[in-house]
Curated annotation (Swiss-Prot):
Belongs to the GatC family. GO terms for biological process: glutaminyl-tRNAGln biosynthesis via transamidation; regulation of translational fidelity; translation. It catalyses: L-glutamyl-tRNA(Gln) + L-glutamine + ATP + H2O = L-glutaminyl-tRNA(Gln) + L-glutamate + ADP + phosphate + H(+); L-aspartyl-tRNA(Asn) + L-glutamine + ATP + H2O = L-asparaginyl-tRNA(Asn) + L-glutamate + ADP + phosphate + 2 H(+). SUPFAM superfamilies: Glu-tRNAGln amidotransferase C subunit (SSF141000). This is Aspartyl/glutamyl-tRNA(Asn/Gln) amidotransferase subunit C. Keywords: ATP-binding, Ligase, Nucleotide-binding, Protein biosynthesis. GO terms for molecular function: asparaginyl-tRNA synthase (glutamine-hydrolyzing) activity; ATP binding; glutaminyl-tRNA synthase (glutamine-hydrolyzing) activity. Allows the formation of correctly charged Asn-tRNA(Asn) or Gln-tRNA(Gln) through the transamidation of misacylated Asp-tRNA(Asn) or Glu-tRNA(Gln) in organisms which lack either or both of asparaginyl-tRNA or glutaminyl-tRNA synthetases. The reaction takes place in the presence of glutamine and ATP through an activated phospho-Asp-tRNA(Asn) or phospho-Glu-tRNA(Gln). Heterotrimer of A, B and C subunits. Pfam families: GatC. InterPro entries: Asp/Glu-ADT_sf_sub_c (IPR036113), GatC (IPR003837).
Length: 95
């Protein structure tokens, strides 16, 4: 399998990217290099090799959840630049 310039142009259009001719040419070469590497990996003999989802034997290295007292609402809000009732007030980010 190989990537053509037409493929790169199509993917760029889908991703709303614009490439110069030089960038598109370089991207084509780089994607073909990546695909060649993946094909090489596919040729490896992995018979008898167990699949891994994680290279570490550790299961859960996080601390246990322990309920403990927290600061009061007033303490949490005392340095807030803007608040409304018992809540932090922040700028609207979604229209």
């Amino acid at each position: 399998m190989s990537v053509t310039r037409k493929d790169v142009d199509y993917i760029a259009e889908l991703a709303r990217l614009s490439f110069t001719d030089e960038e598109a040419s370089r991207m084509t070469d780089e994607l073909n290099s990546i695909l060649h590497y993946v094909e090489k990996l596919g040729e490896l003999d992995t018979e008898g090799v167990l699949p891994l989802s994680n290279i570490h034997d550790q299961k859960n290295v996080l601390r246990d959840d322990v309920e403990r007292p927290s600061i009061s609402n007033a303490e949490a809000l005392q340095n807030a630049p803007d608040r409304q009732d018992r809540f932090f007030k922040v700028p609207k980010v979604i229209g």
